[in-house]
Amino acid sequence: MIAVVGAGLTGAATAWQLARRGHEVTLIEAYDIGHRQGSSHGSSRIFRRAYADPFYVRLTGQAHERWRELEDDASTPLLRTTGGLDMGEDRDPRPIAELLAAADVPHELLAPEEASERWPYIRITGPVLYHPDAGVVDADRTVAACVRRAIEHGAQAIIGTRVTGIDVQDTREQVLLRTEDGREIVAETVVIAAGPWLPDLELPLSLPQLEVTQQQVFHFRQREPSERWPTLIWDGTLHLYGLPSGSDGGPLPTVKVAEHDRGTPTTARTRTGVVDPSSRARVSGFVRDRLPGLEPDPVAEASCLYTTTVDEDFVVDRHGPFVIASPCSGHGAKFAPLIGAMAADLATGRAEPHPRFRLDRAG
């Protein structure tokens, strides 16, 4: 039996992959499905192919295939294509365009005048990379779809109880999990997909250096509701991203804008959930200056958690009876069904971990 601890994007996707392959699976989640205590909630996460690293460009292609596989299995649309823009005084789009070209990813390099004609509601003053395959992932619907299909494929789900004990048996061939409601679950393999809660678990293995931060996101109403906004990556004095909000922004069309960095160090257990007013001021100022198609005062805001490694790569590795499938360093949502497949492969002995995702990698 394989136990999966954590039913966020990674854990839910792993349980779905394992169950659809016919394995005996128990999924354990401390909170409700879709809870707000981690990193996997909300209606809007960016999917993009544009990375300044050929490794991740290739990986996004594999992830796109897995998204369509999940949508087909769940009969639920989860990834909405919008196109995406990369720009900013510190984001040279030309090297990224070269990587996309090498991977046969459709894209355009645009002068500011041409880009401004196409997206007049964005103030564009430099070169822009556009790639049409970018889009928006609904995290809430994805988690719900994965859990539902995992159960329909035969998985057991234990929801609303925390794992309080993890003991490797003397033979090292089984792991005993204890939960706060008194259950004892014996598994041959345990997939840990706890995200920001990972450092709180008492695991018999060494974890890499991790930083948990509280991030803030803000939703700004569109001045013209009929405009179709792309996703945005902006690197300059500020490092921001933007994308259509979905239901998180309320009943009228909104765009989510947030800083990718400048999070506040915290832990999953001690986070305040209080939005940082200095971040609100910076992001609102950016919207006022660069996104004239949005009203500059946010109509909704929220916090979430990043769990980041030193090199900002993921951790997807096996150590004895454990598979560690988190953290995702603030850019893992777009890869969720692919990471689930990787973790399932490790849990069943079908593959070796990628060197960049190993627990003991340098850095």
Where are the regions that the model predicts?
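Short hydrophobic core segments
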Residues: 3-5, 28, 184-197, 340
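Glycine-rich Rossmann-fold phosphate-binding loop(s) that bind the pyrophosphate
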Residues: 6-10
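Active-site substrate-recognition segment that forms the wall
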Residues: 16-20, 77-79, 196-320
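Glycine-rich FAD pyrophosphate-binding loop
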Residues: 19-40
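Dinucleotide-binding Rossmann-like beta1-alpha1 core, especially the glycine-rich loop
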Residues: 44-118, 125-127, 239-240
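Short beta-strand to alpha-helix junction loop
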Residues: 58-59, 86-92, 130-148, 274-279
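Helical element adjacent to the flavin cofactor pocket in flavoenzyme catalytic cores
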Residues: 130-188
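C-terminal catalytic lobe of FAD-dependent flavoproteins
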Residues: 286-363
